[in-house]
């Protein structure tokens, strides 16, 4: 059996494999409770509280009482994490203006994402709103029970020793998972660099901290939701980004995600070592485009989640 299935040109994954026995195909319960209600919103509905699946008569769309004008149920909370900050500047930004580094760009875009989401009825928590170093291991836990999604914003950069490093552009989103690649390992080493500013009590404390953050969370119950949010982010960024859509990647040793208690993604918005990417990320017009695309993706994710859990379930925080 295989856990993969195709919707249009997208290949998606189920929690467990499908099984074929003679002339019958057995699919995970998740296909009934999540996939059908999400992909065929007007036809199927699943009430998570009552564990009740229904097929909707007719072709009219399901209307939820109390929805916002954009179709979102009220009460959602999202945590935005502008990567790095303070004494942890991130990458220096080869093609950013002099004095501008990753920590500045992530904060500028993060604040714009906050404004976009709040204007659409989503409450936002920020891990930082000024140029300060928020402890890496305390960022994701800010999105706990009363939060729907954690989004960490970052800027990628390639080493000058890599062939044609300036010509490589694009964006990708990382979630916790097993399918680590050499490039994902490179990103993890770069983004985990902030830890060296935080482990100050000697080798023993460092070993304990690293053992905690490097633990295998591939069984994270929020893997599928994180993957859904990540794919939507890639889809919406592709509409405004001139670089290559590098897709959704997995890694199980990325500190800021390994401490997540809710669905969580890390977005590499472009390469500071590419002139076009850098211009998009540091210009005010480019930042607004990125922020708008991220907000579009987040709102779509929340709306789809509302449909999956059902109109009878409580909306927003604390689900």
Where are the regions that the model predicts?
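Active-site-adjacent mobile loop/cap segments within catalytic or ligand-binding domains
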Residues: 159, 213-317
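Active-site histidine-acidic residue metal-binding/catalytic motifs
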Residues: 59-149, 155-170, 177, 196, ...
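Soluble periplasmic/extracytoplasmic beta-strand elements of cell-envelope proteins
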Residues: 4-6, 26-28, 52-54, 77-81, ...
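Soluble non-cytosolic domains of exported or imported proteins
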Residues: 22-27, 96, 100-108, 133-137, ...
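Primary recognition of N-terminal secretory signal peptides and signal-anchoring hydrophobic helices
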Residues: 1-79
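Extracytoplasmic/secreted envelope proteins and their assembly/folding machinery
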Residues: 29, 33, 107-114, 137-140, ...
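A structural motif
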Residues: 75, 177-215
């Amino acid at each position: 059996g295989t856990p993969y299935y195709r919707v249009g040109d997208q290949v998606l994954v189920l929690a467990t494999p499908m099984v074929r026995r003679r002339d019958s195909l057995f699919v995970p319960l998740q296909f009934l409770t999540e996939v059908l209600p999400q992909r065929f919103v007007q036809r199927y509905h699943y009430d998570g509280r009552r564990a009740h699946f229904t097929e909707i008569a007719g072709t009219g769309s399901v209307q939820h009482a109390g929805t916002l004008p954009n179709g979102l149920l009220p009460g959602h909370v999202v945590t935005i994490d502008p990567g790095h900050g303070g004494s942890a500047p991130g990458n220096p930004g080869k093609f950013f203006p002099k004095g501008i580094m990753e920590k500045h760009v992530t904060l500028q875009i993060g604040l714009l994402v906050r404004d976009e989401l709040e204007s659409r009825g989503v409450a936002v928590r920020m891990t930082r709103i000024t140029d300060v170093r928020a402890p890496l291991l305390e960022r994701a836990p800010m999105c706990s029970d009363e939060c729907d999604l954690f989004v960490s914003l970052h800027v990628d950069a390639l080493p000058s020793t890599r062939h044609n490093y300036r010509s490589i552009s694009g964006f990708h989103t990382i979630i916790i998972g097993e399918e680590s690649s050499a490039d994902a390992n490179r990103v993890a080493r770069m983004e985990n660099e902030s830890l060296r500013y935080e482990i100050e009590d000697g080798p023993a404390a460092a070993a304990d901290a690293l053992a905690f953050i490097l633990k295998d969370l591939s069984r994270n119950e929020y893997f599928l939701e994180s993957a859904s949010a990540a794919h939507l982010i890639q889809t919406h960024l592709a509409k405004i980004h001139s670089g290559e859509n590098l897709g959704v990647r997995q890694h199980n040793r990325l500190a800021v995600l390994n401490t997540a208690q809710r669905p969580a993604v890390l977005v590499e918005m472009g390469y500071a070592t590419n002139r076009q990417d850098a211009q998009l990320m540091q210009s005010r017009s480019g930042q607004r485009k990125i922020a708008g695309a991220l907000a579009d993706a987040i709102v779509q994710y929340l709306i789809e989640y509302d449909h999956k859990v059902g109109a009878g379930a409580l909306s927003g925080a604390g689900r």
